[in-house]
């Protein structure tokens, strides 16, 4: 029955193939040349020339595949191929010899014949119907020999030899018999590698694994056939099917490249072998993760994710497998492909898992891989685009790693956004994950941005920029600032023009120079101002500056920005003159001064061409002068001399602000100096905060000559005016600490030194360098710093102790270790703290010379060192008396000077203990200090006449209250200044003439005597004229007359201990004291009888109030329970 059906199928197939030739389906293409002659075996088919070879081959293949696919056994399929080959042989007679379509069809038929012959042995070749089929095949091959198809000839030879399995070399290989590799390779080269692949597939399909492995190994050992990846895939398949061969599986895995492995995995998955592909993928992936190799890692992880989900669709299992593979990874970069597949495959929870993976990766040691760390920060910012706080932290972290201008721009853009509160409802991750991530992110920051505003963040970020980025940033910032200033100038000029035009129209006046009436007056001035402001853009003759360090030229003020590129740690050099500085601010001011000098030269030249005022006159008009006697100013002569000398040395025009920083020369007459000292008055300028000797001592020699070259910009003024200090509980301005002249210049407090300075910083450098042993200098420095070291926050009570301690903070490593025989010092305090932990037993040695005591506790060491200096305090009290005597010599009365100086010596020579000084520093000042406020006008107007002085002081004396002569509390008990106490027990006004003080002498805070020219009759005043408000007190010290504000007594909790403020506990007295109480006390102790309402329980003091309450009948029972009424 099956044979009849196959015969019928063969007849129908022949008819369809003949119909293809007779009725062409495709367009006429390349026609075959021929006359339609038929060949052997072509009795069933007719010839024709109406169809092209390409169309015929295409239709032929479709029909043959259709009929062959209807059978699942090899013999009927061989019959279909026999009929197809005979029909093709007849039709191909008209086709050309070198037609590629014919070659393709013949090769396909030959390979199909070979694949079906694998199912038959040698014995079956001589039986019907296989014998007839093979004979027809050989006959057709003889007619098709002109095409020279290799595969067809190979199949014909194999049929003659008895079949595909009958070759003796192949039999030896399959049976694992020893054979020479050369003979095996020669046999393998004699056939098409595709035939060996078909043999291996047949053996694997029949589960003949040993024979298949033997054949596959022989093919792999062949140099040419081994390039075919199928044999490697087949070997892995065989090893996968035999678990005993695990060692061979791993060995061959190591020999296979990952790229080839990916192709093998994909081919295995196409064949439906998912488990084999998954095991192969994991076998290739895990060694890559363990070795940290990123070669083909993205492809392997992606293929693994697809195979894992195909084998097990569970999302939780998938995530667990991802974590398991991540634990085996040694390269942190593998988190990126894993996060990619997790985010794609696990929908909602995938984002949170990815954020957690990033947080875990940041906890690893990534110091050697900043690029990967930046990628992690950028990934977190990509995952959480709506969390502004995390975005800012990530942007700052990226900037700290890259130090690029683009990273800074991102930080600036994020911090310019308005702050947003974190909303847990709209967050992409859970609150737990976010708050675990925040401290991890902040670990990479140099500071916590929550405690800094954007101004501080910008300042520190710009300082961290690299050289090229810093120059680019400064260039862009300067261009933006110039554009903004130019725009504001144009707007202001436009407003001025509009105002001028309105004024001209309202008054009816016209501009004679404006003929057209369109252009207003201010337009010409606007052009001049814009030209002066932006000379670098308009004028082509812009001066060029050459950098001395790199020999590059820059236009105009670009040299200032270029200087940022040459900054080094602890050293800043001027790129124009080469001068070195240790402070960046001083270097920048010095460099800007160079540029402004040249700019002023150009402006002065332009103004001179326009016949306006010359540059020298403009500088003299705008500069501040030094006030001399009776208010006359001789600063012009001094400025002209200074300008001439400076122009000869530097060949540059000195700016107008230089005169403010010029010191008074030593050659000034003594009377002029005394007048400056006596008439000096404070103003509102404030200077830089005091720097210790260790920071400023090295730079003083090179910066002292440049004191007149630094400009005083608004930023410095705003920064300086915010510095205030507290002395004895009151806010004190620096002018109250330092003596100043009428122009606000600060005088050196040293004994016999007459130099004055414009800024406190310069004064401090001069005083600490030139007069390091002067007592007044030490006390002034002590007072300015409030006795506290700004590095270690240690409090000192002795000025010499304070100065000696500051000398130990040597720049740049200012934080030193106190341990015995340890000379380590550090720049930052946390470095010192880490170093201190390295000492197992901390023992600090006393820093006093010739003292070698060791202490384990710092408080004990501090107390011990203070005892050394307290013992030296009485010996050093003679120098202030000399200073006071030098101060008083300016008075005209020599007798009074002698008396006051002798009294002062007695007062200061009294030693005062340190504890007493601290206690008395909180006490209020005496009424003598109330004179400060009224004498303020005297000191501010230093050039007033003596008559005005007499009248001012007389007014002060008239308002001084009378004090009872027998009252000890009204005396000036103690005046504490700079930690020293001056005790004065003499009352201000007394009825006893022997106890009256000299009214021509007024004691000030520092113990000096203030001479007075008030007549004697104004000294005593009635008690009724006591002032209602405290007055100011004038202070005449060794370096001038100073006014101090009245002392305002602070609240008791600020200076008293709690035991003096809290209410004492009540004590029980003896019974005899209780019985001794008077009858009057017993009367007050009697209790008053009170009346209460029975219902609402309201209490009343008398019966009338209770009756009025009851008469209203509005009260209700407080506890109204029915059960109580019934029981009653």
UniProtKB/Swiss-Prot annotation:
It comes from the Eukaryota. PROSITE patterns: ZINC_FINGER_C2H2_1, ZINC_FINGER_C2H2_2. Keywords: DNA-binding, Metal-binding, Nucleus, Phosphoprotein, Repeat, Transcription, Transcription regulation, Zinc, Zinc-finger. It holds the Pfam family zf-C2H2_ZN292. GO terms for molecular function: DNA binding; DNA-binding transcription factor activity; DNA-binding transcription factor activity, RNA polymerase II-specific; zinc ion binding. Belongs to the krueppel C2H2-type zinc-finger protein family. May be involved in transcriptional regulation. This is Zinc finger protein 654. It comes from Homo sapiens.
